Design a protein with these regions (language model features):
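Nucleotide-activated sugar donor-binding and catalytic core shared by glycosyltransferases
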Residues: 1-370
Length: 370
């Protein structure tokens, strides 16, 4: 009977870990799972030693304010590992915490195999971490198709198991644009209140430059409709059916993140935006980007494609007039639209529709049996 210990520290990691637990139990029915995570992991059959509500701290200020809680979480995880003595430790994203736990496990439980599912984005920044990941982990299970080649440059191995977003969207029913309703612009302002409050007004103002188009704002799970109300004008719609809204829109304005990839896979031309605080430092950040980051892009669409497919209005370029100008091209330049949609098709081919969690579980269970 295999014992698996999983660590996810954020809501997205909880979601992916839960899918992995389900597959582990299907492929290894007698297995037991414990770890640190959220409600989805618990519902999938994982005994939790700590909940992500006590682990997910966003931003430097939040981390600084919660240093005591973070140290406590390390102690909880370390003691849980020693108590459980699992056959395998499975890490899901959450890099700073998980790399420390990998090091602890390697020293204290040398017989435990370590797997990193959804490894840190070392191809974007903190590239030196690639050596620690390869040294500490028995297998690295990536969700982007370029990751194996990136690791190979350093003499290490990484398995591409599939992309969960592409897998999910391959199952979403396609909804054709309805000629019976006015043409629309979809606004995807993000998933956290802070980023929505920073971005939504400028995103809406850019879309309002085209009054012939209906504006549909896609609400994030867990954020009440009342939060959006002050931003909306008469005739502007709030929806929680994001996938349908995006598929029926002529174009979209999207806050950078997984939503840009979702929008591309749903076939909607888009412009991406991203707010950076501390405006006096924005020019310096842009200048230093090649030194700090290993890639020239912010959005997953452009990173995966290896070139600019969608326009990125980031930092000081995130201005209403620039977003509106790009939106105008998306709405009215048919050649530009077709080129972007063709690039989306190539992107979809690169990602494939591999069942990521099932593939990762198969690798883990096979290695555990060997």
């Amino acid at each position: 009977m295999a014992k698996y210990f999983l660590i996810a520290g954020e809501a997205s990691g909880d979601l992916h870990a839960a899918a992995l637990i389900t597959q582990l139990k299907q492929q290894d029915p007698k297995s037991q799972c414990a770890g640190l995570g959220g409600d989805r992991m618990e519902a999938a059959g994982c005994h939790l030693y700590q909940h992500i509500r006590h682990m997910a701290f966003m931003g430097f200020a939040a981390v600084l304010a919660n240093l005591g809680n973070i140290r406590r979480n390390f102690r909880i995880a370390e003691q849980a590992l020693l108590d459980e003595r699992p056959d395998a430790l499975i890490l899901i994203d959450y890099p700073s915490f998980n790399l420390r736990m990998a090091s602890f496990c390697r020293k204290q439980l040398p017989g435990t195999k370590i797997y990193y599912y959804i490894p840190p984005k070392v191809w974007a920044w903190k590239r030196r971490r690639v050596h620690a990941i390869a040294r500490l982990c028995d297998e690295v299970l990536g969700i982007f198709p370029f990751e194996p080649a990136f690791y190979a440059k350093y003499g290490y191995r990484c398995n591409y198991v599939g992309n969960p977003t592409a897998e999910e969207l391959s199952r979403v029913p396609r909804v054709p644009m309805n000629p019976g309703i006015p043409k629309s612009i979809a606004i995807l302002p993000g998933s956290r209140p802070s980023e929505i409050s920073h971005c939504l007004t400028k995103m809406l103002d850019a879309a309002r430059a085209y009054p012939d188009y209906r504006i549909v704002v896609c609400a994030a799970p867990g954020i009440d409709d009342a939060f959006y109300a002050p931003y909306l004008r008469e005739g502007e719609t709030l929806t929680r059916d994001t996938y349908t809204a995006v598929q029926q829109a002529t174009a979209a304005v999207v806050n950078s993140g997984t939503a840009t990839l979702e929008t591309a896979l749903l076939g909607c031309p888009q412009v991406a935006v991203y707010h950076l605080a501390l405006s006096p430092l924005i020019a310096l950040i842009r200048w230093a980007q090649p030194l700090v980051f290993s890639i020239p892009y912010f959005t997953l669409v452009n990173i995966i494609a290896g070139r600019q497919v969608i326009k990125e209005c980031v930092a000081n370029e995130f201005r209403t007039e620039l977003v509106a100008a790009e939106l105008g091209r998306l709405l009215h330049d048919e050649t530009y639209r077709k080129e972007m949609l063709a690039s989306y098709e190539h992107l979809s081919t690169l990602l494939g529709t591999h069942p990521a969690a099932a593939t990762a579980a198969a690798i883990i269970t096979s290695k555990q049996r060997s």
